[in-house]
Amino acid sequence: ATEDLPSFEDNIWAVYRQTAGLSKFPKTTLSKMLAGKMVNVGPSIGNTTHSISGNSTPKDLETAFQLMYLTFMDPRFDENEFQTGIQQIKAVLPNIQNDPDFQYQIEKEKVFYNNNPRVLALNDELLAKANLATIERVYRELFKDAAGAEVTIVGNVDLSTLKPLVEKYIGSLPKGKKATDFNKDNCISVAEGQIEKTVSLKMQTPKSTVHQLYTAKLP
């Protein structure tokens, strides 16, 4: 829903991913538990898809599966952890907003994507609307089961080792009955037609930047 979008702006979603632990384990505890292991697993929520992906060394493969399972079944939503990251954004946001390159990026995306509400610009108003409760509600709805999920595993994996891990950690996920509906209205499309726009910004060191974007439909 449109009102949920501020909570999934790239920087805010990154705050959740970077500050959240798993299950009963805070991020700091989880990091200590994973010390010495080469493994990384995390969720992704986009405009039209959601997923969990990761990577590991062969010896840490089961740890990767365990993290995947917990990311699916027992995510962690801690307001204090989340606010730590939000406060960090608030501290640097004034400088970011005063950066001409940032201002230009905003204007450019407005033109490229025809003011699509799903193309968000980080600002004070958006931060005020973002909240962890929305992230948790949407997350739990999307990852409540594995209906429609596709599993892809590539790399240096011994099949005799892999098979029991898949059966244990993926086979035990709730199957569900129906995959999440695909909503084509959530797609972000480039504006059609020939558009020209000049953006003038105050700079200490003036410069010119030109962006040209050409698009075509695939046959």
Can you name each region flagged by the protein language model?
Residues 142:
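A short acidic-Thr-Gly-centered motif at the start of a beta-strand
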Residues 1-18, 22-73, 86-94, 100-127, ...:
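M16 family metallopeptidases and their MPP-like homologs
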Residues 20-21, 72-76, 93, 161, ...:
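A generic secondary-structure signal for well-formed alpha-helical elements
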Residues 128-132:
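A conditional alpha-helix N-cap/helix-loop micro-motif detector
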Residues 42-44, 77-84, 150, 176-182:
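Surface-exposed patches in mature extracellular/periplasmic domains of secreted proteins
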Residues 112, 145, 150-218:
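An aromatic/glycine/proline-enriched structural segment found at the starts
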